[in-house]
Amino acid sequence: HATDGEVDVTIGAGASSTATIAGDLSVAGDVIMADGKGIDFAADASPSAGMTAEILDDYETGTWDGVVTDGTNPMTMHGGYDTGYYTKVGNLVTVTGRFYTTSLGSASGDIKITGLPFTIANNGAAYTSGGAGHGDGLAITAGHSVSFYGQINNTYIHLTVWGATTGVTGMQASEWTADGNIMIGFSYRAA
């Protein structure tokens, strides 16, 4: 529309082109990109020396089902408190949730929460950890707290107990009761 400054562009099937826009771009609908494509931030004049990518090529939100287990024997999860939320932006995944059991089942020894929505990246820089924001029904020593760390190249977090004199030890099934529960929230790098 030459009189109002608007431009309509139609590109034929199979065509490839680049449009350069000097002003703002306003879109009334979704911007849909082909798989593996994204928003390129290559105009960054001074990227960090460790920069490995400038394309935002993934965004996703959803739910994940966590299970407290010793790796072989899952505890019975409370149906209302076994699902958490996640948001994935690029390769950074943020998960939250409250995980509540109704029975220990046959679990023994070190326990973990399985079911993370994406595999944690497989390198030492990908280790991540956190502390439980809330917990009930736990049989840990007074003054101790529950923490955790994500296992690289896997989809679970190790539960740990932090004590002033003992440091960090793997949380045992015996330190969790039938109605034990914790709330967690943390971010990790996906593989």
What are these regions (language model features)?
Residues 8-10, 30, 83-85, 147-149:
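Short, surface-exposed charged micro-motifs
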Residues 76-83, 98-191:
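Extracellular jelly-roll beta-sandwich "head" domains, especially the C-terminal globular C1q domain
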